[in-house]
Design a protein with these regions (language model features):
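Non-catalytic interaction-recognition regions
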Residues: 1-184
Length: 184
């Protein structure tokens, strides 16, 4: 319907749109059923994820030294990132069980684990610059085996993105990123 509407409005690219449907998203307690009142409102779920991220981050000391404003921003980024990653890491044609508690973990195949690894990498780079290391001259660098493996995995990124686009599967990119951060 949307394709036809866009075409009639003069947007010729509307014909190229592809409907991207997902499998069912269930909760650990079972299927969501509107008649039984077990449907989760998206806004409530997002609020729950942000609050869970705040609690877990506090428990782990990841908000130490942050202002209330910074803690709120971090909690929102981590909580919503956890939700988005959990949905993206599963092939869209498969059903999934969304477990809010598992998705907020800072270990394993989760958004917070990937975000935390990214923050660690940024910290290492920032400290290297502060120590006077150049981030442009690599002529004297002799990478070790682990670094070579990481570079080779990074080189796979364009092919992974192309395959994800060809197969309409963002899960390929999500899982590639997880495999990449495990190397770090």
């Amino acid at each position: 319907v949307l394709s036809l509407l866009l075409d009639r409005l003069g947007f010729k690219w509307g014909k190229d749109l592809v409907h991207f449907s997902y499998g069912m998203v269930e909760l650990p307690e079972g299927k969501m059923k509107s008649r039984e009142g077990t449907v989760v409102d998206a806004d409530d779920l997002m609020d729950e994820m942000v609050n869970s991220a705040r609690e877990v981050s506090k428990e782990l000391g990841k908000l130490d030294g942050c202002t209330a404003e910074e803690a709120n921003a971090i909690s929102e980024i981590v909580g919503l990132g956890a939700l988005k990653y959990f949905l993206l890491k599963v092939d869209p044609r498969k059903n999934m069980t969304f477990n809010p508690k598992e998705s907020i973990d800072f270990n394993g195949n989760t958004g917070p684990f990937i975000q935390y690894t990214y923050a660690r990498i940024r910290s290492v780079l920032r400290k290297a610059v502060e120590a006077g290391y150049s981030m442009t001259d690599y002529s004297k660098v002799e990478p070790n085996e682990k670094e070579i493996s990481l570079i080779q995995r990074l080189a796979d990124f364009p092919a992974v993105v192309a395959e994800a686009g060809r197969t309409y599967s963002p899960a390929l990119i999500a899982n590639y990123v997880y495999d990449l951060v495990k190397e770090y």
